[in-house]
């Protein structure tokens, strides 16, 4: 069984500008440099105004994770996330994310939407987290989900700041 977590942000910029920044290779590299942890990397990247596909690697320290999760983590703990986005009409983008956590009984996936809203835009992400550990899986899913929501907020803030510095 998995648990769902919802994230929502309302950037002041239109969806096309937010999309362009979110999938920009320079922005992704800068974001990973600041937020990605040890051995963070942009592993694959292709993007244009209609479509984007990229794979990123985050390196995380087990001691930075909740205690309920630590015993299940390898010492070289990393997360590999593949995102694909496509333009879905004027001012609308739809995306999917698949998250691989090698060496753990956990995985995650997500559906993403970005659309124009008023003078800005709205970003919505629904993440499904599954941890296959008897009796503790639900508690670990809650911990991992909370960490994902924090990371999404930090990534959004970084991207919006990057946009303002690179306008």
Question: Over which residues does each language-model region extend?
Answer:
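Amphipathic hydrophobic-ligand
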Residues: 36, 71-80, 104-110
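Hydrophobic pocket/interface hotspot
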Residues: 18-22, 125, 159
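A conserved amphipathic terminal alpha-helix motif
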Residues: 86-87, 137-167
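Hydrophobic ligand-binding cavity/cleft-lining segments
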Residues: 1-62, 68
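Short, ordered beta-strand-loop transition motifs
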Residues: 43-53, 87-90, 115-118
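Short secondary-structure junctions
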Residues: 30-37, 89-92, 104-105
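Helix-adjacent hinge/juxtasegments
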Residues: 61-88
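Beta-strand/loop substructures that line and gate deep hydrophobic ligand-binding cavities in soluble
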Residues: 55, 84, 93-145
């Amino acid at each position: 069984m998995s648990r769902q977590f919802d994230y929502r942000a309302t950037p002041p910029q239109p969806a096309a500008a937010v999309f362009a920044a979110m999938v920009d290779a320079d922005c992704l590299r800068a974001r990973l440099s600041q937020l990605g942890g040890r051995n963070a990397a942009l592993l694959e990247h292709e993007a244009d105004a209609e479509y984007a596909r990229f794979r990123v690697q985050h390196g995380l320290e087990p001691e930075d994770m909740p205690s309920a999760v630590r015993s299940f983590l390898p010492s070289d703990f990393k997360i590999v996330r593949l995102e694909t986005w496509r333009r879905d009409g004027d001012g609308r983008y739809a995306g999917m994310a698949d998250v691989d956590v090698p060496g753990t009984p956990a995985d995650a996936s997500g559906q993403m939407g970005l659309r124009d809203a008023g003078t800005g835009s709205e970003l919505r992400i629904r993440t499904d987290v599954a941890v296959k550990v008897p009796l503790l899986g639900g508690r670990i899913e809650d911990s991992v989900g909370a960490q994902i929501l924090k990371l999404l907020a930090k990534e959004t803030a970084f991207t919006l700041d990057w946009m303002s510095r690179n306008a």
